[in-house]
């Protein structure tokens, strides 16, 4: 959005961890992670434990719109760079603080990582086959989601025109990603079972294997689509499946019919029929 972003890296000769993480571009030996994280940013090195480093950070903050930090709660305060000192330099500064579990609470001082949030939020417990273990996502999902939450919250704070502290954490970001499920668990005691690629309120929905060993994804969250799929798989005349509740109650039979239909055709044939 046109922001001039200055990334502060630690003064240890290594810098940001993504500079050495994962795949490297063979053309310049720079990691793809760093190209993603560091793109469109200016970078500087500051030793925030030194007087010079703290002074330089305060100078930057004096003319900045936003400061984003992801230290454990209390770290900036111990460095004498907390909101009090920063707002003395710039009362309009938006300070966005990203942690594992928030600035307060019993887990505030714990280190936070994406995997912890994915497990503790219950997200991993929702994923996997009914007879299998919980599954973690194969990407840094929490990190990406929390970054979006932090960016949105920061923009809202900027729009207010008032200097303030924005408190964002990994765990709450994952909880809000899960829609009504946390509320259903808290208010109703609902414990969603693992359904593979399925979801509790829409049937059929999942991935199915074709005759040529490809996978196709099918979802029927709207009634017209559900009726069309049922007609294709031979269940269009079944009155018991005319409602979402009826299909959910008869999930196994509907899934078996869809699996059989898809398994007897190639991926191209299935897609052709579904887009007719």
Where do the model's predicted regions map?
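Short amphipathic beta-strand starts and helix->beta connectors
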Residues: 30, 199-204
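Conserved Rossmann-fold dehydrogenase catalytic segment
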Residues: 103, 131-139, 160-174, 193-200, ...
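Active-site-adjacent beta-strand anchor residues
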Residues: 47, 69, 167-171, 218-220
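N-terminal helix-loop segment corresponding to the beta1-alpha1 unit
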Residues: 1-158, 189, 194, 268
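Oxidoreductase and adenylate-handling cofactor-binding alpha/beta cores
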Residues: 147-165, 176-188, 228-237
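Aromatic-enriched alpha-helical interface/lid elements that frame and gate functional surfaces
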Residues: 204-276
């Amino acid at each position: 959005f046109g922001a001039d972003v200055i990334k502060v890296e630690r003064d240890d000769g290594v810098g940001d961890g993504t500079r050495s993480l994962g795949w490297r571009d063979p053309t310049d030996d720079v990691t793809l992670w760093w190209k993603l994280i560091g793109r469109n940013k200016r970078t500087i090195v500051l030793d925030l434990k030194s007087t010079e480093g703290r002074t330089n950070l305060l100078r930057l903050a004096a003319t900045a719109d936003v400061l984003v930090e992801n230290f454990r709660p209390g770290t900036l305060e111990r460095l004498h760079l907390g909101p009090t000192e920063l707002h003395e330099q710039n009362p309009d500064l938006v300070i966005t603080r990203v942690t594992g579990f928030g600035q307060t609470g019993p887990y505030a001082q714990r280190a936070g990582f994406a995997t912890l949030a994915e497990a503790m939020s219950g997200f991993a417990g929702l994923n996997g086959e009914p007879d299998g273990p919980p599954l973690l996502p194969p990407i840094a999902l929490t990190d990406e989601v929390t970054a979006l939450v932090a960016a949105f919250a920061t923009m809202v704070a900027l729009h207010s025109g008032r200097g303030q502290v924005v408190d964002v954490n990994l765990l709450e970001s994952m909880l809000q990603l899960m829609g009504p499920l946390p509320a259903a668990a808290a208010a109703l005691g609902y414990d969603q079972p693992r359904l593979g690629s399925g979801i509790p309120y829409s049937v059929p929905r999942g991935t199915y294997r074709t005759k040529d060993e490809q996978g196709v994804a099918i979802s029927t969250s709207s009634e017209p689509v559900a009726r069309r799929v049922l007609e294709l798989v031979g269940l269009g005349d079944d009155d018991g499946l005319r409602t979402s509740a009826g299909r959910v109650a008869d999930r196994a039979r509907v899934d078996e019919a869809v699996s059989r239909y898809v398994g007897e055709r190639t991926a191209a044939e299935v897609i052709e029929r579904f887009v007719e």
